[in-house]
């Protein structure tokens, strides 16, 4: 792993410590579908699947946001909370998308490629960033379609007239004071936008993108590593402030209530945290700059070395067993030789013995 001053020198030591925490004692302790060789043998296929999922999520989320009608809400014509003027947007969608994508991409490119020169870090950072955007858009679109909500300036989006009120569906509810979208005169797209207050899409996307960038900078620059560089702190906190200001701007131009914005922030920040952790070893630990690619490379080496060590131990044990067997055979042969020698000596001694009258015993036997 290359080191450009933004990384620690003991990256492999950190990874090895984490590896020991995920060594499972037996197969019953392992998670479902846990196979260390699966990712090793299908690295490219798994990454292609990740990118494919990003594209699919972006397409589905965009369709939900732009094409699918939201759940209709009933409203009163004399409701002051939806009668605010429709002001010009402080940050329109055409400015939001380049802002939340270009700035994080430029920072990731600058640090991972220019400074670190680590293509794997760039790949995982970019993949995690796009995963964060795609999941956020999908969730935001789903909430808007199934829950929705009236914008503070909804009546400006609807623009009912006396003729449209008469031609639309009759009012319902106690006192017959609640109307539906059938009395609106604006286009279906604009009315649909006016009913899409919850949650704030600007807030969720901004929090997701700049929240991920804040985690990325925190991991690479190590803001709280006892160095006290205020510029690093300002870079990181600036990401969160930018996301906050984008959300507040939606309250200022009467597009959302503060609760809508708060819901968007919550979705975006939670998704950015989870997607960053999905691609890196931790969120706030000393190893939060280490990608899962580096983690798995070290884990595979550890596993291979462990298997080789076990194989060598087995071979040594077999050799020791063979040596022990040979030693046992030699001992048995030595015992047999000793027995034969003793029997020969006994026979010789017997032949040399004499009877009490001086006649050798062998002659007496004859």
Swiss-Prot record:
UniProt biased composition (Low complexity): 308-349
Q: Which UniProt keywords apply?
A: Membrane, Transmembrane, Transmembrane helix
Subcellular location(s) of the protein: Membrane
Membrane topology field: Multi-pass membrane protein
Tell me yes or no: is Zinc among this UniProt entry's keywords.
no
Q: Where is the composition biased (Polar residues)?
A: 350-366
GO function term, MF aspect, one: phosphatidate phosphatase activity
Q: Which CDD domains match?
A: PAP2_containing_1_like (cd03390)
One Pfam family from the UniProt entry?
PAP2
Bilayer-spanning residue ranges: 45-65, 95-115, 127-147, 199-219, 228-248, 256-276
Predominant cellular place of this UniProt entry's protein? membrane
Q: GO terms for CC?
A: membrane
Q: Which family does it belong to?
A: Belongs to the PA-phosphatase related phosphoesterase family.
Q: Where are the stretches annotated Disordered?
A: 308-366
Write the protein's name.
Answer: PA-phosphatase related-family protein DDB_G0271516
Q: Name one GO biological process term.
A: phospholipid dephosphorylation
């Amino acid at each position: 792993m290359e080191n450009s001053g933004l990384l620690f020198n003991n990256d492999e030591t950190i990874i090895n410590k984490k590896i020991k925490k995920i060594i499972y004692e037996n197969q019953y302790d392992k998670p479902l579908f846990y196979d260390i060789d699966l990712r090793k043998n299908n690295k490219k296929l798994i990454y292609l699947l990740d990118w494919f999922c990003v594209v699919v999520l972006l397409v589905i989320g965009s369709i939900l946001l732009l094409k699918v009608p939201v759940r209709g809400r009933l409203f009163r014509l004399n409701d002051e909370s939806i009668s605010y003027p429709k002001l010009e947007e402080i940050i329109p969608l055409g400015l939001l998308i380049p802002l939340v994508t270009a700035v994080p991409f430029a920072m990731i490119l600058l640090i991972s490629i220019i400074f670190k020169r680590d293509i794997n870090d760039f790949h995982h950072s970019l993949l995690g960033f796009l995963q964060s955007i795609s999941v956020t858009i999908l969730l935001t679109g789903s909430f808007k379609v199934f829950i929705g909500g009236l914008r503070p300036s909804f009546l400006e989006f609807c623009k009912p007239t006396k003729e449209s009120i008469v031609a639309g569906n009759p009012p319902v509810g106690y006192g017959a004071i609640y109307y539906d979208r059938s009395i609106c005169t604006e286009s279906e797209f604009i009315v649909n936008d006016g009913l899409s207050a919850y949650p704030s899409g600007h807030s969720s996307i901004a929090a997701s993108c700049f929240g991920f960038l804040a985690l990325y900078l925190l991991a690479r620059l190590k803001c709280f590593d006892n160095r006290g560089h205020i510029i690093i702190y300002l870079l990181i906190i600036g990401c969160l402030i930018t996301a906050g200001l984008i959300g507040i701007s939606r309250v200022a131009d009467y597009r959302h209530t503060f609760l809508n914005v708060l819901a968007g922030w919550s979705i975006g920040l939670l998704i950015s945290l989870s997607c960053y952790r999905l691609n890196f070893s931790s969120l706030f630990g000393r190893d939060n700059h280490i990608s899962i690619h580096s983690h798995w490379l070290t884990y595979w080496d550890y596993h291979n070395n462990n298997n080789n060590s076990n194989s060598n131990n087995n071979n040594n044990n077999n050799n020791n067993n063979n040596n022990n067997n040979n030693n046992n055979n030699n001992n048995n042969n030595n015992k047999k030789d000793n027995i034969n020698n003793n029997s020969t000596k006994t026979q010789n001694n017997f032949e040399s013995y004499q009877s009490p009258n001086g006649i050798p015993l062998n002659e007496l036997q004859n």
